[in-house]
């Protein structure tokens, strides 16, 4: 991977140094809107069994994404499904993050906002309620990840009127286990 002391750039994000198992989710089909700032943090998605949904391309010494979305494997028993996510801050400053979803009726994000210190990683769980709402899953759902610089206020106070420093959207996908 080159020099272990320097971060490795992948797409428009930066991967953390010395974390071989951290594979960034890569670019997404949902591009930023005009004027939105580039996302500077790294996101890693794992399914319920903690297996990464990204693969490493050893020939090019970089990570490439196999799946560029949050996938929920829906079961017949209609139990809620979770996806574990890790958010890494490769910058030199503490940042606050916020995760939004397209429907609070069918998704939950725990925690929806918080802080990530420089060179640290936080865990986030996204839940899909998995109820019989066929019209809900037929829509194009996505999760929006935002970050801004921290200034000492609480996360709620900070997000009440802060300027977004980076944006990234990942689409949701629903897979049947039939």
UniProtKB/Swiss-Prot annotation:
- PANTHER family tied to this protein: MAJOR SPERM PROTEIN (PTHR21513:SF2)
Under Pfam families, the record lists: Motile_Sperm (PF00635)
InterPro entries noted in UniProt: Ig-like_fold (IPR013783), MSP_dom (IPR000535), PapD-like_sf (IPR008962)
Residues spanning the signal sequence: none
Q: Which residues form the MSP domain?
A: 52-177
Stated name of the protein: Uncharacterized protein R05D3.5
Q: Which domain of life is it from?
A: Eukaryota
What is the species listed in this Swiss-Prot or TrEMBL entry?
A: Caenorhabditis elegans
